[in-house]
Amino acid sequence: LIQAKSIKEVGIVKTDIAQRLSLFIPLTASYFLFNETFSQLKIIGFIVGFSAIFFTLNKKSESKSNNWVYPLLVLLGFGIIDILFKKVAVFKDFSFTTSLFLIFCGAFIVSILFLIGKILIQKEKLESKNILWGLALGILNFGNILFYLKAHKALAENPSTVFAGMNMGVIILGSLAGILLFKEKMTKWNYFGVLLAIISIIIITLSQLK
């Protein structure tokens, strides 16, 4: 909901910047909260990764609004959510699949209440295509988070690898989807950013093998 409000207030570009930069929060938590040690090779991978974020987001924003309250909430929200997912993955009292099911049930209830509010208060009409798209995105999101938690469980001692790998993967797949599905125009710097994201994943993977 906050992300949608941010897009409405300041545009998708500034919101996307805030979401991508939220990677800084879980990486910091990996070091101070989860006591992970970073090798020099992994640090280089992080630097290349943040460079990839900069170049892929090197786009003009159509919004002239400078209200950074919502983008800041997006940055903090996504960063904290990543940390919580890591906690859920290694939580021993419940299996992570049970925790994930409860999380999605809670999110579903909140979404239904929000939808009912929009129908009753704002008199918006509920269209079948919106329901179908919502279900499709929900299923994809569930699968995405499920494998995200599995990765955290498999690499419990190296959460930064999962955090960074996920973020770089989103950059690559998001860029490909934009080009192939939505015919989005990318600059040479955007393509360079995608290349850096691939290089970052390779470097971080190599750091795991050493």
Regions found by a protein language model. Name each.
Residues 83-106, 126-130, 157-158:
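Juxtamembrane helix-loop-helix junctions in multi-pass membrane proteins
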Residues 1-9, 59-70, 104-156, 179, ...:
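Membrane-interface interhelical linkers
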Residues 62-94, 109, 210:
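Glycine-/small-residue-enriched transmembrane alpha-helix faces in small-molecule transporters
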Residues 29-31, 41-58, 189-208:
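Hydrophobic transmembrane alpha-helices of multi-pass small-molecule transport proteins
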Residues 3-18, 90-98, 148-166:
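Structural motif at transmembrane-helix junctions in multi-pass transporters
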